[in-house]
A protein has these predicted regions:
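NAD(P)H-binding glycine-rich loop region in Rossmannoid oxidoreductase-like domains
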Residues: 36-41, 45-89, 99, 117-119
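Conserved Rossmann-fold NAD(P)-dependent oxidoreductase catalytic core, especially the SDR/UDP-sugar
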Residues: 93-138, 160
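Amphipathic terminal alpha-helices
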Residues: 297-302, 306, 310-328
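Flexible, glycine-rich beta-alpha linker
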Residues: 117, 160-177
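Active-site Tyr-X1-5-Lys
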Residues: 134-160
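N-terminal Rossmann NAD(P)H-binding glycine-rich loop of SDR-like oxidoreductase domains
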Residues: 3-23
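Mid/C-terminal beta-alpha module of Rossmann-like enzyme folds, strongest
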Residues: 211, 215-279, 296, 312, ...
Length: 328
């Protein structure tokens, strides 16, 4: 069995590659000629050099594979067009390549995002997979367009969509900034309301993704994967302080107006950088929402999904890795 993985040189994709290797698959990874293979070093993978924008390279890369796991995508971009090129068109190209040169494909697993749906309206009513999608940002809209392409292929390919919430874990550079700030004695909480969010450790995510890819029940379906409880940032901060053995941490509550102002300034100065800003106005919109929560009941019912780590085990494991690798 051959599993083809996009985005394997990155944070989540490298863990996906490891998970499918553990399950006995031959793993083939799409990489650019210039991609860093830091997280794939020493792994017995096949490397397919190509790009999601190069249809001929994709057709060659997926030829004869059994499973495709599409992880690659843009989380930061200069404009709406870049998001749609990276997330929507790239997915469309990969689906067409799979249709053309992977006739025995058993699963096309697409990693999407909770941002496709927009935030839940209340803590008592987390978002369900069947709810109408109301993305708030160009990123969310581009991921929704990618999902639409996947769903359009349901009669042609055995597709499954996984919607992930905020993801943390070893190798992550995004939520790392939060852990670093707490290690330096500062915890910044956004707003004065009791925000809740779905969260998942990368190892729980990739285990759930692989289980979904191997289950006949999940063909044509969409699932949220996350820890079962919803967390507050106060809870996350408390677990982080304990893991860091940091007692004296200054907690700052940042008004939404300040957050949005900083986001706007970051976006402005990002226009003069060679890379798109990680924090921009649309990211600010995401950050000030109260309930980024999705129900995992469908995943539990259909293929027995259950997170094993939770923040009580996942955060200490992550921080230990950061320390061992001199990030903290």
């Amino acid at each position: 069995m051959v599993a083809f993985i996009t985005g394997a040189t990155g944070f989540v994709g490298s863990f996906v590659a490891e998970e499918f290797l553990r399950r006995g698959y031959t793993v083939r990874c799409l990489t650019r000629a210039t991609s860093s293979l830091q997280w794939l070093e020493g792994l017995p993978i096949e490397r397919a050099v190509g790009s999601l924008n190069d249809k001929s390279s994709l057709e060659k890369a997926v030829e004869g594979v059994d499973v495709i796991v599409h992880v690659a995508g843009l989380t930061a971009a200069r404009n709406r067009e870049e998001f749609f090129q990276g997330n929507h068109i790239g997915t469309k190209n990969l689906l067409e390549a799979a249709r053309n040169t992977a006739p025995n494909l058993k699963r096309f697993l697409h990693l999407s995002s909770l941002t496709v749906c927009g935030p839940a309206q209340s803590l008592e009513r987390p978002t369900l997979e069947s709810d109408p999608c109301k993305p708030l940002t160009a990123y969310g809209e581009s991921k929704k367009a990618a999902e639409d392409e996947v769903n359009a292929m349901r009669g042609v390919l055995p597709v499954t969509i996984i919607r992930a919430p905020a993801i943390y874990g070893q190798r992550d550079t995004a939520i790392f900034d939060y852990f670093k700030a707490v290690s330096q004695g500062i915890a910044a909480l956004i707003g004065f309301d009791d925000k809740r969010l779905s969260l998942i450790h990368v190892e729980d995510l990739v285990r759930g993704m692989a289980d979904a890819a191997e289950s006949p029940q999940t063909i044509g379906e969409t699932y949220f994967l996350a820890d079962d409880p919803f967390y507050s940032w106060v809870e996350i901060t408390d677990v982080t302080k304990t893991a860091l053995q940091k007692k004296n941490v200054l907690t700052l509550r940042l008004p939404h107006g300040i957050v949005m102002g900083v986001a706007g300034i970051s976006e402005f100065f990002g226009k003069f950088s060679s890379k798109p800003p990680v924090f921009n106005y649309e990211k600010g919109i995401d950050f000030v929402q109260k309930y980024w929560i999705g129900s995992v009941e469908k995943a539990k019912r259909d293929f027995g999904y259950q997170s094993k780590l939770g923040i009580e085990l996942g955060i200490p494991k992550t921080i230990t890795w950061y320390k061992e690798n001199k990030w903290l």
